[in-house]
From Swiss-Prot:
It holds the Pfam family CXXC_Zn-b_euk. It comes from Nematostella vectensis. This is UPF0587 protein v1g245604. Signal peptide: none annotated. The keyword S-adenosyl-L-methionine does not apply.
Length: 159
């Protein structure tokens, strides 16, 4: 078992509490097989609402697949209690937003996409955030100012 943390870095403008919303949020990852080094050719996703049985009766995981090259079964489990928001106080710094229990694979890339929420820094106005382009902007009517999330980047660390 290897625990991997996904860290996010972004510049938040007049918003805070950027988070993956709900148990149906899809974490899109590229994965590398630790047995043979094969990297997935397409994005794979996992979410808390979906789980699959792990071969050999070892419980369930949020993502289970067989490596196309070496045919080894690998799995990833989202650590539910490790999901945290990215706050305005983290602005411009890497911060761990989720941890994965990886067996046989390790993530190499993350695609943020849709399903994020944030709130106005001074107004708590809720916003639905789409990070497909790694930038998002809107207008907070209550505060009468622009809001946005810019320059989203990510990295993985071993925990």
């Amino acid at each position: 078992m290897v625990r991997i943390g996904l860290q996010l870095k972004a510049n938040l403008e007049n918003v805070t509490n950027l988070k993956a919303e709900g148990e149906d949020f899809r974490w899109y990852l590229m994965l590398k097989c630790m047995n043979c080094g094969e990297v997935t050719k397409q994005w794979v996703y996992m979410c808390l609402m979906e789980s699959q049985p792990v071969k050999g009766g070892r419980g369930y995981a949020h993502f289970v697949s067989k490596c196309k090259l070496c045919h080894r079964e690998n799995s990833v489990d989202i650590m539910k209690d490790s999901i945290h928001p990215y706050l305005a106080s983290h602005n411009g710094k890497f911060h761990t937003i989720v941890s994965f229990d990886c067996r046989g694979v390790e993530p190499t890339d993350f695609s943020p996409r849709t399903g994020w929420t944030a709130e106005g820094e001074n107004t708590s106005t809720p916003f639905e955030v789409d990070l497909t382009e790694k930038d998002w902007s809107d207008y907070d009517e209550k505060a009468q100012n622009a809001v946005g999330v810019y320059g989203v980047t990510s990295q993985f660390i071993k925990l």
